[in-house]
Structure formats: C-alpha cells, structure tokens
C-alpha cells in the first residue's frame, strides 16, 4: 500500500475537482470531492454527514459552519463551509428529488445507508487515473491536499493543528533526516 499524496499542482487540482462536472457528469461525486478538498475531514466523517449538518432545511440556506464529532478522535470539530463547497453542494442538492435533514449527503445504494468507503475510494481513484495524476491519490489525499495548500498560503501551524485536531506538532511533521 502506498502513502497517500496531496495533489500539489493547482491545475491538476482544478481538473480533479471538476472531473465529475466536466468529464463524467455526476453531481454527487462532484460534491464529494468539493467537500473533501475544502473541509479536511477524514473520509469516514465525510461519508457520515447528513444534510442537516450543512443545510438549514427550515430556513432554506446553507450553514456557515459544519460542526461534527470525529469518529477517530471523538473530538468535536467546526469547519467553515466556503463558497466553493456551498456551490458544489447546492448544484447536487438541486438535482435531487427529495432532501431531508436526516438523509445522508452521500447515500449508499441501499436505503438509509451512507456511501461506503470503498465506493468513495473508487470514485476518487477513477478520476485520478483518468487524469493521470501521480500515484498515491486516495480518499486521504483530499485531506492532505487541504493541508498542503493551507500551509503554502501561510496558515500558521497552530491553526492547522486545530483544524486537524492534533495535539502535538510532531505528529504532523514529516520525518527529517538527522544532520551529519
């Protein structure tokens, strides 16, 4: 198994993000990638999201933030829903017949189940393969891509640690060779 890699080239990232809009239209898959790249959530948390987490059904508008409890850490996280994510989710939502607050954003094949991690992997891997992206693109690549661009834009390590719910900075630092 290879290590997941972020998408480092901005043009490749844009092509990846728009793959299910331009190349093989599928608004659910497009929304999955938009939310994945812009939220830094683990795929297990992303797939468990319900419409009520991102959209106020009664007021008929998208929330400014999504608040969820991470499966892996049990910690609560609050994530801003940016314009790009709202646009992707809005397009997808408009294509659906019925949206309920309790419904999964990314439903599985069977009634009242979330999309499986393996299917999410196939969706992401398919787009990466068709676009000839480097090896190592997987579900976790979306989370890493968020961090890569946030770091490149100068986001302080303390803020990234908060976004990723890390307690120690060395958890996220790549290992460096010892000086000779």
Report each predicted region and the residues it spans:
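Short, charged phosphate-coordinating catalytic segments
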Residues: 36-59, 158-159
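Active-site-proximal segment of tyrosine recombinases
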Residues: 45-47, 136-137, 147, 155-166, ...
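Single conserved hydrophobic/aromatic residue that forms the stacking wall/gate
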Residues: 169-180
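C-terminal catalytic core of Y-nucleophile DNA break-rejoin enzymes
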Residues: 5, 71-90, 102-125
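Short helix-to-turn junction characteristic of helix-turn-helix DNA-binding domains
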Residues: 36, 150-151
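Basic, Lys/Arg- and aromatic-enriched nucleic-acid-binding interface segment
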Residues: 10-39, 43
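Extended, non-globular alpha-helical segments
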Residues: 1-13
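Conserved tyrosine-mediated DNA breakage-rejoining catalytic core shared by Y-recombinases
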Residues: 48-76, 80-85
């Amino acid at each position: 198994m290879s290590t997941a890699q972020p998408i480092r080239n901005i043009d490749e990232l844009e092509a990846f993000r728009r793959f299910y809009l331009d190349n093989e239209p599928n608004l659910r898959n497009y929304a999955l990638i938009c939310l994945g790249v812009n939220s830094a959530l683990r795929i297990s948390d992303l797939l468990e999201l319900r419409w009520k987490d991102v959209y106020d059904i009664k007021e008929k508008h998208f929330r400014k933030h999504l608040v969820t409890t991470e499966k892996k850490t049990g910690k609560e996280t609050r994530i801003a829903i940016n314009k790009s994510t709202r646009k992707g989710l809005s397009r997808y939502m408009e294509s659906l017949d019925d949206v309920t607050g309790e419904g999964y954003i990314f439903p599985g094949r069977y009634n009242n189940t979330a999309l499986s991690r393996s299917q999410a992997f196939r969706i992401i891997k398919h787009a990466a393969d068709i676009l000839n992206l480097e090896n190592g693109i997987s579900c976790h690549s979306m989370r890493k891509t968020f961090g890569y661009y946030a770091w490149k834009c100068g986001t302080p390590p303390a803020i990234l640690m908060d976004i990723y719910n890390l307690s120690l900075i060395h958890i996220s630092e790549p290992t460096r060779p010892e000086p000779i």
